[in-house]
């Protein structure tokens, strides 16, 4: 689910037959020097998970990378979190 104010996307993938309960969060934040960063957080639901930050020179490049990551996760079975 995308938060309109921050551009944050919360996804989850739950498959009880495989004991799989995963989350994936994507956010775009401005940097101090005029670029933008894509912040990813992922892991098992109930844990703090792992994080990765990728910095880009422009907002457009960051948004393109975030959309590419979001599409890849949706192809793998991740769906909107459903929380607000």
Residue map of PLM features:
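Short N-terminal "domain-start" leader segments
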Residues: 1-37
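A generic structural signal for ordered alpha-helices
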Residues: 4-7, 16, 40, 44-47, ...
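Intrinsically disordered, low-complexity segments enriched in polar/charged small residues
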Residues: 17-18, 45, 78-81
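Short aromatic-glycine-(Arg/Gly/Cys) micro-motifs in beta-strand/loop hairpins
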Residues: 25-53, 67
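Solvent-exposed, flexible loop/coil residues
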Residues: 37, 60, 82
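A short, charged, amphipathic alpha-helix used as a generic interaction element across diverse proteins
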Residues: 48, 57-74
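Short, charged/polar low-complexity linear motifs in solvent-exposed/disordered segments
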Residues: 53-57, 81-84
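Short, mixed-charge low-complexity intrinsically disordered segments
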Residues: 72-84
């Amino acid at each position: 689910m995308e938060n309109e104010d921050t551009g944050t996307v919360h996804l989850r993938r739950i498959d009880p037959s495989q004991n799989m309960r995963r989350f994936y969060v994507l956010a775009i934040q401005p940097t101090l020097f005029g670029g933008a960063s894509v912040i990813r957080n992922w892991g098992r639901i109930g844990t703090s998970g792992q994080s990765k930050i990728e910095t880009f020179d422009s907002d457009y490049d960051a948004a393109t990378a975030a959309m590419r990551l979001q599409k890849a996760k949706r192809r793998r079975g991740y769906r909107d979190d459903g929380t607000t």
